[in-house]
């Protein structure tokens, strides 16, 4: 395992570079110890749930959503990535309008494959490192962790926004 601080910084740098190599537009790493920002986002979720704004979506109540340690025991950090969904396919249909993110292959599959490639790379670089893939179907505050990782901020529209890509990821 990596013991020296400089080694941790180096592997973090290489990991983000690997994510960019795999086709992600942005990548950042957040420490699980979190910050006041994660606590604020978790508190906001708890208020939202207590007001029953989630209605029938009982899956939103998962404790794993509030405590990443329940999702992946012994986790130390989160790699957050952003994948742009602007593509060359144009919706020239003037009758039907289709959301950009839904044009093309299912992004869950595309992103999962790219993250799995990063996982294989991790296995080679840090053999004793455990990892788990979460693509926005896991009980994880993914936007809050991405914000904590520094790849963007959560805007008034509740989307994650980056300086480079806006909210197109």
Task: Please identify what each model-predicted range represents.
Residues 1-169:
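Auxiliary alpha/beta "docking" domains used to position bulky ligands
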């Amino acid at each position: 395992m990596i013991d020296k601080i400089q080694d941790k910084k180096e592997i973090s740098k290489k990991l983000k570079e690997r994510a960019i190599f795999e086709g992600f537009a942005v990548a950042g790493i957040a420490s699980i110890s979190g910050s006041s920002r994660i606590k604020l986002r978790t508190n906001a979720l708890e208020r939202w749930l207590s007001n029953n704004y989630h209605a029938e979506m009982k899956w939103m109540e998962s404790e794993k959503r509030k405590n990443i340690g329940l999702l992946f025991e012994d986790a130390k950090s989160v790699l957050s990535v952003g994948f742009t969904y602007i593509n060359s396919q144009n919706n020239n249909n003037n009758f039907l309008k289709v959301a950009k993110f839904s044009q093309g292959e299912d992004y869950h599959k595309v992103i999962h494959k790219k993250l799995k490639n990063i996982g294989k790379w991790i296995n080679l670089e840090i053999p004793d490192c455990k990892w788990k893939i979460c693509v926005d179907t896991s009980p994880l505050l993914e936007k809050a962790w991405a914000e904590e990782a520094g790849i963007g901020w959560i805007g008034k529209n509740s989307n994650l926004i980056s300086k480079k890509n806006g909210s197109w990821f």
